[in-house]
From Swiss-Prot:
Residues 171-222 are annotated as: Linker. The gene is ciapin1. It comes from Danio rerio (Zebrafish). Its main location: cytoplasm. This is Anamorsin. The lineage of its organism: Eukaryota, Metazoa, Chordata, Craniata, Vertebrata. Residues 6-170 are annotated as: N-terminal SAM-like domain.
Length: 311
């Protein structure tokens, strides 16, 4: 019993399966009760009734399953999850199960059993020992699963439940505020700082040679560029009509606009005096616009078909 980790006052759930001997089961339960101190702290449950018994969650400090040597118990995933549910946080599980050294249906390897225990939510899964399977237990296993191999052995594994309930949650204290960091500036070497310091007195010193910025330019840099050389190549083809780009930046759009305004101004009708549009007070005696209201310069005005020819 010492290797099971039982302690006085701890509640224990003992899971058994057929064909366990009733006398062996009773003797094993009494030995457990002697360690924990009271028979009422030990509960017995048949493996086939485990999922139907509705044990209270987190009610047992230790769960022992399949430890009777005259029986062999295959733990399903549902059974392992139920065992984890009824265990208290920090509780322990000790189970024994027949395993095979090769892949086979009905019986799994020790590695797969360990993975199944972890998937049930238990941690610290450890393989304690491996021993040969008794002939009686092997016969019962063959009858139940139909396994016919000769690589069977009995493995004992221990696991524990985390110190928190499976599915429990807690509030995390996170601070997303900007941390105040104090940066310590390195001390400057006085000699280095003095070398990089320039005062007004240094500028008046005759020993200080200043570079003339104009001396850095050559004759080509001082030439004024020809405006035609600054234009882009668009519209240079004489066979095509000049057309500025949508987002013209070379000045062709402004040039075409000025040419259009000049052509429009040249096409406007001109009078001899240039005052016809101002009204009758400024028109000549033979002006064809006599009697018509004033109009804007360049505005198209239709003359009535009168006796202009007589004038």
């Amino acid at each position: 019993m010492a290797d099971l980790g039982l302690q006085k006052g701890k509640r224990v759930l003992l899971i058994w399966t057929q064909p366990s001997s009733s006398s062996a089961l009773k003797q094993f339960a009494e030995s457990i009760a002697a360690v924990v101190g009271d028979q009422s702290l030990v509960s017995l449950e048949n493996s086939e009734r485990l999922l139907l018994s509705s044990h209270n969650a987190s009610s047992y400090d230790c769960v022992l399953s399949g430890l009777l040597t005259d029986s062999s118990l295959i733990h399903s995933s549902e059974m392992l999850v139920e065992m984890a549910r009824v265990m208290k946080p920090g509780g322990t599980l000790v189970l024994e199960e027949p395993v095979t050294g090769s892949e086979d249906t009905g019986v799994r390897t020790a590695e797969k059993l360990m993975s199944a225990i972890k998937l049930a939510g238990l941690v610290s899964v450890t393989e304690v020992k491996t021993e040969p399977l008794s002939p009686k237990a092997a016969a019962a296993l063959t009858e139940r699963t139909g396994f016919s191999g000769n690589t069977l052995s009995r493995v004992r594994m221990t696991a524990s439940k985390p110190d928190f309930e499976v599915g429990s949650s807690t509030q995390l204290k996170l601070s997303f505020g900007k941390k105040k960091t104090t940066t310590v500036k390195p001390a400057l070497d006085p000699g280095t700082a003095q070398k990089w310091t320039l005062s007004a007195n240094d500028m008046d010193d005759d020993d200080v040679d200043l570079v003339d910025s104009d001396a850095l330019l050559d004759a080509d840099d001082l030439k004024k560029p020809d405006p035609s050389s600054l234009k882009a190549s668009c519209g240079d083809d004489s066979k095509k009509k000049k057309k500025a780009c949508k987002n013209c930046t070379c000045g062709l759009a402004e040039e075409l606009e000025q040419e259009s305004k000049a052509a429009q101004k040249a096409s406007q009708p001109k009078s001899a005096c240039g005052n016809c549009y101002l009204g009758d007070a400024f028109r000549c005696g033979s002006c064809p616009y006599l009697g018509m209201p004033a109009f804007k310069p360049g505005e198209k005005v239709l003359l009535a078909n009168t006796d202009i020819a007589d004038k």
